[in-house]
């Protein structure tokens, strides 16, 4: 069965999906960009849940992901993924970013979630080149969904038009029919 992957331009905090992915930092305590937006929209319960995870597991290293409740968000849960900081590509950034996406997909499936939304992990303050990050994201999600039944649908939520067009082009090359 062909994977169900879509892309939209919008605000990930308003997505009515089972789980949204947060591009988190290792502390899980919120920050700038999408991380800060998710924490603000979710309310104080999300920060408390992240504090509990930190107390139990410590910091979340790059490539890893953890799951928490969603607080005031319309989603059921939030998966916090820590992507790599871009250092020019010679510090295994690509494999770390791929691992982050894979771990998110695995956590969603393991928890029975059928629909999920991703931001463009590591492309904000972490400086990962958008085109390279989009290619890794699409390839990783496509490969995973081609082999596994869950999650059933993944949506990439793009903050800007440039990123949206990158994802649209990549998904079209993969033969995805996009709702535009």
From Swiss-Prot:
It is an enzyme of class 3 (hydrolase). InterPro entries: Macro_dom (IPR002589), Macro_dom-like (IPR043472), O-Ac-ADP-ribose_deAcase (IPR024900). One of its GO terms (molecular function) is ribonuclease inhibitor activity. Keywords: Hydrolase. Its EC number is 3.1.1.106. GO terms for biological process: purine nucleoside metabolic process. Residues 1-175 form the Macro domain. The active site is at 35 (proton acceptor). Substrate binds at residues 11-12, 25, 33-35, 122-126. Gene3D superfamilies: Leucine Aminopeptidase, subunit E, domain 1. It catalyses: 3''-O-acetyl-ADP-D-ribose + H2O = ADP-D-ribose + acetate + H(+); 2''-O-acetyl-ADP-D-ribose + H2O = ADP-D-ribose + acetate + H(+). It comes from the Bacteria. Deacetylates O-acetyl-ADP ribose to yield ADP-ribose and free acetate. Down-regulates ribonuclease 3 (RNase III) activity. Acts by interacting directly with the region of the ribonuclease that is required for dimerization/activation. Belongs to the MacroD-type family. YmdB subfamily. Homodimer. Interacts with RNase III. This is O-acetyl-ADP-ribose deacetylase. It comes from Enterobacter cloacae subsp. cloacae (strain ATCC 13047 / DSM 30054 / NBRC 13535 / NCTC 10005 / WDCM 00083 / NCDC 279-56).
